[in-house]
Swiss-Prot record:
ATP binds at G96, S97, V98, A99, V100, G101, K102, S103. Pathway: Cofactor biosynthesis; coenzyme A biosynthesis; CoA from (R)-pantothenate: step 1/5. GO terms for cellular component: cytoplasm. It catalyses: (R)-pantothenate + ATP = (R)-4'-phosphopantothenate + ADP + H(+). This is Pantothenate kinase. Belongs to the prokaryotic pantothenate kinase family. Disulfide bonds: none annotated. It is found in: Cytoplasm. SUPFAM superfamilies: P-loop containing nucleoside triphosphate hydrolases. Keywords: ATP-binding, Coenzyme A biosynthesis, Cytoplasm, Kinase, Nucleotide-binding, Transferase. The gene is coaA. It comes from Bacillus velezensis (strain DSM 23117 / BGSC 10A6 / LMG 26770 / FZB42) (Bacillus amyloliquefaciens subsp. plantarum).
Amino acid sequence: MKSKELNLHTLYTQHSRESWAGFGGHLSIAVSEEEAKAVEGLNDYLSVEEVETIYIPLVRLLHLHVTSAARRNQHVNVFLKHPHSAKIPFIIGIAGSVAVGKSTTARILQKLLSRLPDRPKVSLVTTDGFLYPTAELKRKNLLSRKGFPESYDVKALLEFLNDIKSGKERVEAPVYSHLTYDREEGAVEVVEGADIVIIEGINVLQSPTLEDDREDPRIFVSDFFDFSIYVDAEESRIFTWYLERFRLLRETAFQDPASYFHKFKDLSDAEADTMAASIWESVNRPNLYENILPTKFRSDLILRKGDGHKVEEVLVRRV
């Protein structure tokens, strides 16, 4: 039976916003409105009420997984007579469409997890830095496919994750500039001594094709994850958020002469909407249906958003 014929929803317990809020228990992590606003993505929305209702229970669940993994690793190291093995970070993957709010979810989780009683060190890395540089994309004739699986240096991403899970003390990731639409030459994101690492990106639950992996062992990015989250919403909502974000960028970042999109700064509202819709239909929508949405049920937890970026339902995988 093909996977698309399976009712994969049965793999998950489903929780309404109201019932999920009750799982926060006695965990209390203070977050001010200013702090919530500071981690918002462009055109995203995050209130203290959203933090308390959705993210505090999620952090409590994640903490259970983190502590359980630490105990298991300790027992295995004793069994193998390696009681002083290197610290292995717990890795959380966050996936979902462009404009769905992954970055906001990643940043608020980083803030909340770092405020747990044991004060873990939490690092956040986005996979944007692993996009091939623009010059390389042009050379490979992939610029129009930017964001699709083939536009990422997956080998470098896998090496980065392998170093983390191998206990390497200091690991570096390339940094991406949304202003120049390219890697920042010479800039790196350093992961050093982390207890938890969050990896955020549209591609993190995707698997390579047989052709891509013909020469190498079939290792997926998600093989390195201890827990994965998919941020979900109806396509119509995501498109609306994308359109609104494009308008805001035209009024802000596009005005900067250093912006890759500076040439679009004087577009009228109608012209901006037309361009955004064209990009959505030619790039983001196909990528969503071909590569991102099919990975949803590979995640351990799904955050399903409704109007205003508010999470309406949480699905937690049973196995």
